[in-house]
Amino acid sequence: MRRQVIIWVVIIIASLILGVIPNISTNADTHDLKLNIESLAIPESHVTTSTGERGAAIARLNNEQYLLGGGKGGFALYLYDSKSNDERRLGQIASAGARLDDSRFAITDIGVLSKKGNRANVVVSYPRYDRVRKCVSLILGSYQINFGAKSAVKRNGTWFTSNPCVPVGAVQHAAGRIEVIDRKNVYLTLGDLGFSKINDEQARGDLGSLFKVSKSKVLKISQGHRNQQGIVLIGSDLYTSEHGPRGGDELNLITKGGDYGWPAVTYGEPYSAGDYVKPTATGSHEVFTKPLKYWVPSVAPTELVVLPEVEAWGEWSSQIVMGTLREEALIFIELIDRTTVGQVVSADVGERIRDLEISDSGQIIATTDSGKLLIISSSRRLP
């Protein structure tokens, strides 16, 4: 496989946000930051269809090994070794009949519950197409993986199936981000799936919500979400990133019982008069839980990770990094405290970032929609 090393000097625009009230940021300072970006081709796990392409889902194991999810059929798991840049196919998480030939029908996230020797227990989320009812639901399945010479993926059961099953529309709004709490519990995001009745609280059912899920129990934590493509747990605080319409992308601190406003309010704007839903109020979040930070215009946020406490990351140690699609950048987010955002810094990487992880050695690992894996490190501290 092709291995390419790129050293990029990234000019970072730092935006200083003052106060607790969410605000559109303005440029306050400019810092030079050298990011070392190593680019590796991962063609086996790259999702490619007649309708487009999508980067692989990624989850860290150990010893610089990862699980990748995707492939040509969207539903395959791979063992990836970043030292050798080797992808080994392990098996399928669902049948080909559970998807359409569409890059959106692919593994959305992987959560590693436990690993011992050549075996691991994981949960995997994906949108499933029902060919009889011609509708789509988000699934969270439980699997045991064997990494040995006879690799295998065994399904143990289904932890979650979203209801209602809705007509195929904005499948990209499935969300499906997983944050592992412990060996038996995870948080799971569910978007609105482009459901035309999303403004009807009874009809929308599970859609637009965040759940705590185990093998035997599903608990709704919050609602009013559009498409939460990033999630990270910092201590007991849960943060998500969320797509708004034509702007209004959000960073949220999740509170139990919170309503985050969609589709009633957004800081973004409707796409057109014929869109599947029209918000009641734009440019506002009155009455509902406000985001910690929002972006206008849109950056199209994806996964969230927390940088480790290592000297190489300097003042950014223990802070949040967010991937983006439209912006093709990593966004560094300073938390002054659990509810207050400080500097927000955008670092251009020139790729649509689908998923993020942190390596054993503290580097940022990113998968891209072009079928690459980026290993990103800081070569010097910010002043």
Identify the role of each PLM range.
Residues 43-75, 299-306:
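Beta-strand-rich domains and repeat architectures in extracellular enzymes and scaffolds
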Residues 357-383:
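Blade-level signature of beta-propeller repeat domains, shared across WD40, Kelch, NHL, RCC1
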Residues 56-58, 110, 178, 228-231, ...:
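Hydrophobic core register within WD40 beta-propeller blades
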Residues 60-63, 113-118, 180-183, 233-236, ...:
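Residue-level detector of Asp-centered blade-edge/turn motifs that repeat once per structural unit
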Residues 1-12:
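N-terminal Sec-pathway targeting helices
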Residues 72-73, 128-130, 192-194, 244, ...:
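Residue-level signature of beta-propeller blades and closely related beta-rich strand-turn architectures
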Residues 27-32, 67, 105-107, 137, ...:
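Beta-propeller domain segments
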Residues 30-49, 84-101, 145-168, 202-230, ...:
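Blade-edge beta-strand/turn elements of extracellular beta-propeller
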